[in-house]
Swiss-Prot record:
One of its GO terms (molecular function) is glucose-1-phosphate adenylyltransferase activity. The lineage of its organism: Bacteria, Bacillati, Bacillota, Bacilli, Lactobacillales. Involved in the biosynthesis of ADP-glucose, a building block required for the elongation reactions to produce glycogen. Catalyzes the reaction between ATP and alpha-D-glucose 1-phosphate (G1P) to produce pyrophosphate and ADP-Glc. Signal peptide: none annotated. It comes from the Bacteria. It comes from Streptococcus pneumoniae serotype 2 (strain D39 / NCTC 7466). This is Glucose-1-phosphate adenylyltransferase. One of its GO terms (biological process) is glycogen biosynthetic process. Pathway: Glycan biosynthesis; glycogen biosynthesis. Its EC number is 2.7.7.27. Alpha-D-glucose 1-phosphate binds at G164, E179, K180, S190.
């Protein structure tokens, strides 16, 4: 039986610009907002959009990501007619090949896609923070009788040169694609979200592989090929909150924006929930010296210091006399007695020893996964 649309989430990126935070995990597995990992947003969008089959394409350091996703039950994707499949590079008869790019990762998983038998494939990045109804985008794709639909976001002209820019006609048909142009003609930036008619994309990828034509990347190769071939390629304009958290500064900024109950992501909207793996933790403990304001504090935290405009993830500790300001403290991290943290991201399981000061006033500071700063005590 043919399924209407299969979602494929590209989640194999290393995220080198996140430095210490991705030395041992893939970027989509990095924590966000105290309770989530970045990939939760794409997975939740799929679940809320009524997509029942999702493939997650992994490559770099996939263990934490695989454990987090599990069988997809946290997103309601573990039913008889639904599921999440983890797609990793594998050795085939022609030899072992790593994914060489975004579209090459899709080509390497043709057998899986054919088995699902979709009419359309939705290609997503697993490293953006946003809410989006993919069903609306699919309807636009159908209405335009498009071969390819690209989700675009209007960006300030001064920032347009950082993105792949789509130049369109009056009907939103894409007539030209420019990758990070020095002099952009448009402000419609690609979000890295695509809907393809599967058979057309399949035929193009197979033909390119047989002829040894480089077709490894959607932005650099596939979209230009579609335009040159005269395929009907349309833009789908998205106007909601969308954040690329590929740098330390942007990740910190997105977390700080998320703190507000009236944040642009509309995180408290119960009609479009963001789901995540639900780990059971004990209740929070606020000690006699605890002072917490304008902050998000998740289950299992121990606080006996001062926390202002910050996020404490599951099981984080802020001990007596410690001060945390404008910072993100990830799961299991410990801020020792008298330590002072300002404008920083403290990675999972990290230990900031007693009296240590970390000041990110000039540049957001980062402490890596399980990193120890200062001299740890037996209590840590």
């Amino acid at each position: 039986m043919k399924n209407e649309m299969l979602a494929l989430i590209l989640a194999g990126g290393q995220g080198t610009r996140l430095g210490k935070l991705t030395q041992s995990i893939a970027k989509p597995a990095v924590q966000f907002g105290g309770r989530y990992r970045i990939i939760d947003f794409a997975l939740s969008n799929c679940a809320n959009s009524g997509i029942h089959n999702v493939g997650v394409v992994t490559q770099y350091q996939p263990l934490a990501l695989n454990n987090h996703i599990g069988n997809g039950s946290s997103w309601g994707l573990d039913g008889i007619n639904s599921g999440v499949s983890i797609l990793q590079p594998y050795s085939a008869s022609e030899g072992n090949r790593w994914f060489e790019g975004t579209s090459h990762a899709i080509y390497q998983n043709i057998d899986y896609i054919d088995n699902v038998n979709p009419e359309y494939v939705l290609i997503l990045s697993g490293d953006h923070i946003y809410k989006m109804d993919y069903d609306d985008m699919l309807q636009s794709h159908k209405d335009n009788n498009a071969s390819l639909t690209v989700a675009v976001l209007d960006v300030p002209l001064k920032e347009a040169s950082r993105f792949g820019i789509m130049n369109t006609d009056a009907n939103n048909r894409i007539v030209e694609f420019e990758e990070k142009p020095a002099q952009p003609k448009s402000t419609k930036a690609s979000m890295g979200i695509y809907i393809f008619d599967w058979q057309r994309l399949r035929n193009m990828l197979v033909a390119a592989e047989k002829s040894k034509v480089g077709m490894s990347d959607f932005g650099k190769n596939v979209i230009p090929n579609y335009l040159e071939s005269g395929e009907s390629v349309y833009a789908y304009e998205f106007s909601g909150y969308w954040k690329d958290v590929g740098t330390i500064e942007s990740l910190w900024e997105a977390n700080m924006e998320y703190i507000s109950p009236e944040n642009a992501l509309d995180s408290r909207n119960r009609q479009w929930k963001i789901y995540s793996r639900n780990l059971i933790s004990p209740p929070n403990f606020l000690g006699a010296n605890a002072h917490v304001e304008d902050s998000l504090v998740v289950d299992g935290c121990f606080v006996d210091g001062t926390v202002k405009h910050s996020i404490l993830s599951r099981g984080a500790q802020v001990r007596e006399g410690a001060e945390v300001l404008d910072s993100v403290i990830m799961s299991g991290a410990i801020i020792g007695q008298g330590a002072k943290i300002k404008r920083a991201i403290i990675g999972e399981g990290a230990i900031i020893s007693d009296g240590v000061e970390i000041d990110g006033t000039d540049e957001v500071q980062v402490v890596g996964y399980n990193e120890v700063v200062g001299v740890a005590t037996d209590e840590d």
